[in-house]
Amino acid sequence: MHRRSSKSYSSRNSKTPERSKIPDCVIASNKSAEYNYFLDKTFEAGLVLLGSEVKSVRQQKISLSEAYIYEDNSEIWLANLYIPEHKTGGWTNHNPRRLRKLLLHKYQIARLRKDLLIPGITLVPIKFYFRNGRAKLLISLARGKKLIDKREVIKEREATLEANRALKHRLRRPRAQRNTQRSVTPRSTRENKNVQRNKARSARCNVRHEN
């Protein structure tokens, strides 16, 4: 009977390496999301993209600023995401702002539909990235901020900026003082030595004249 080699047996039983959950490359992010909304639960969704769209996205030509998400007939759709036409697409090029379907599990869609029934809750796109060579979109359940909340965010940003400036000023100040001390101390010591030498010379000259 033919015996199985140890190599083939070990290769079959060897575990396949797990795919990393860290994004390979972040292509675009919605910077205004944290300013305009209170973000809650996040979900990772896949996208149905065309070949010309993937080429444009690889060149980081994408804008999430005007994109929004809605649910229709138990499906999640991404609208107004801007992906420009690719220069080599030709007649097969895509519509830059076409509707794009998001790929989620059934239990995730059911959970999102339940949460979207709450008044004031919406879905917001956060980040567009590639993971293991596949396009992914990070979406979040969010609640809109009022004008007072936005003013508080601006105040917090200004406070953090002022604190960072104060820290930088404190860190730079000791270095400047050290440099001035290093530059001043050698000159003062040289001047003292020169004064002492001049006094010694004048004393010697006086002694000679007296003799």
Swiss-Prot record:
Keywords: Cytoplasm, RNA-binding
Region of interest called Disordered, as start-end residue ranges on this chain: 1-20, 170-211
A GO BP annotation: trans-translation
Primary location group: cytoplasm
Compositionally biased spans, kind Polar residues: 177-187
Family of this protein: Belongs to the SmpB family.
Name listed for the protein in its UniProt record: SsrA-binding protein
Protein source organism: Tropheryma whipplei (strain TW08/27)
Lineage, uppermost ranks: Bacteria, Bacillati, Actinomycetota, Actinomycetes, Micrococcales
